[in-house]
Amino acid sequence: MNKKIIFSILKIIIIVAILFLVFFIFSNKSKKYNTDIDKNFISTKIEETKHPMEIESLRNREYPGGDFIIEEKLSNGTNYEQYIVSYKSEGLKIYGLLTVPLAPKPEKGFPAIIFMHGYIPPQEYSTTGNYPTYQARLANSGYITFKPDLRGHGNSEGEAVESHFSEKYVVDTLYAISYLKNYIAVDQNRIGYWGHSQGGEIGLRVVTISQDIKAASLWAGVVGSYKDMFETYNDKIDFLENATSTSLVIENGLPNKNPNFWNKLDPYSYLNDIHASIQLHHGTKDDSVPIELSMHLKEELEKLNKSVEYYEYTEDDHNISNNVNLAFQRTIEFYDKNLSVYTAEKY
């Protein structure tokens, strides 16, 4: 074999080797690129599948307000006007009771209270039939008040839910806050919250999500952590007797089995983010919601140096029936202190 043939063969071998090397390099790059795409896709899917009850998920949403629709003008109270109004939450028409002081409007508007009812069987609830005297006490003290019915209650659209296992009532409340802030007579820098029982539970979530609430008074609230409710005081909470059969528990397990999931839903994981002043009231003979839940919240807030007042009422029940006048006196003093014009200017 002459040198020319040998040289030609070597040339072919070198060219083939170079081509193979180039193919190998680009093939690996392509695989890496595809892997990166896969990782990004997986990451995106994980983000998309965040549970809607997670506190962070609720913080990242928007709750645009608008103008209340006046559905009916009711007879005036002692020192206030009252209206049945409606607003929109996730496209649903939600009704509520709005009260407005008859006094001249302050330069920057009246302070206002989101007033949240406790659990009432939705089919028995009515806009004007529940908590009217409670709301009137605040209205007579110079506060605009708005009590949203919540979805599935009274004439409001949508389906009622279990507040411990759904974000829907919190969403209705956050929309209500936006509408209340937009109301012409309201000073949007002086908004408080009042909640009883289930309304206390909703309120605790709301103050970890929104900084619009400057002061929250929670009466006999379901304000425990998920650990409190499922483990520590489960035997004292009748409304959790069927909790293990809810889809949220079936799909994700109990808090002690899947703490990572439940911690993201639990307002106790976000107590340090609370900017509102908190006031807690509870009767020692409450047989619906154990007083230990309010005691635990008080202790945790104090550890974080948060502003918290705590009142317990000896031998009193879930509605603080024997001490309701004292409890309201303390509540109104609390709002007067934390929702004054001077206080609002600090925010």
Regions found by a protein language model. Give the residues of each.
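N-terminal cap/lid segment of alpha/beta-hydrolase-fold proteins
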Residues: R61-E107
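Short beta-strand/loop motif that positions the catalytic acidic residue
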Residues: I274, L280-H282, D286
